[in-house]
Amino acid sequence: MARTKRTAYKSTGGKVPRKQLVIEAAGKSAPSTSGMTKPHRYRPGTVALREIRPYQKSTHFLIRKLPFQRLVREIAQDFKTDLKFQSAAIRTLQEASEAYLVVFLESKQHSNLARMYSQNKSFPWLEGKRRQPQPM
């Protein structure tokens, strides 16, 4: 037989399906699994943490610059009209507001995670209302 050249292909890394053993017809039957398998589910919170990680690594603003600038100008008009802002001032306001939001949401996240792990399905603002004495 003549030798021929073969091109190398990268392996896809997939597993080769195993051959099914032939079961003898002596009364033994294979368990029927009708192809129904459960979908893979991650533990609660795993997917949320995976979505958070890119935002933790990044250093850019999470709020878009122009909508934030419009909001700042709109709020400032309530106090005084015809105000002008330097771009550095708006950038500083945006950094401060995002830092505040991150701290605020982190504290809420920790309380929500603690509530999730304790399996307590109550809400703090409702508990405060329950503790108040009812007027007679």
Curated annotation (Swiss-Prot):
SMART domains xref list: H3
Residues recorded with modification N6-methyllysine: K5, K10, K19, K28, K38, K57, K65, K80
Residues found modified as N6-butyryllysine: K19
Modification sites for N6-glutaryllysine: K15, K19, K28, K57, K80
CDD domains from the UniProt entry: HFD_H3 (cd22911)
GO MF assignments: DNA binding; protein heterodimerization activity; structural constituent of chromatin
Annotated positions of the N6-(2-hydroxyisobutyryl)lysine modification: K5, K10, K15, K19, K28, K57, K65, K80
Nucleus among keywords: yes
Phosphothreonine, modified sites: T4, T7, T12, T81
Posttranslational mods: Acetylation is generally linked to gene activation. Acetylation on Lys-19 favors methylation at Arg-18.
Modified residues (N6,N6,N6-trimethyllysine): K5, K10, K28, K57, K80
SUPFAM superfamilies linked: Histone-fold (SSF47113)
Residues recorded as bearing N6,N6-dimethyllysine in the entry: K5, K10, K28, K80
PROSITE patterns cross-referenced by the UniProt entry: HISTONE_H3_2
Pfam families: Histone
Residues annotated with ADP-ribosylserine modification: S11, S29
Residue positions where N6-succinyllysine is found in the record: K15, K57, K80
Sites of Allysine modification: K5
Record PTM Phosphotyrosine, positions in chain: Y42
Protein task: Core component of nucleosome. Nucleosomes wrap and compact DNA into chromatin, limiting DNA accessibility to the cellular machineries which require DNA as a template. Histones thereby play a central role in transcription regulation, DNA repair, DNA replication and chromosomal stability. DNA accessibility is regulated via a complex set of post-translational modifications of histones, also called histone code, and nucleosome remodeling.
Record family assignment: Belongs to the histone H3 family.
Listed name of the protein: Histone H3.3C-like
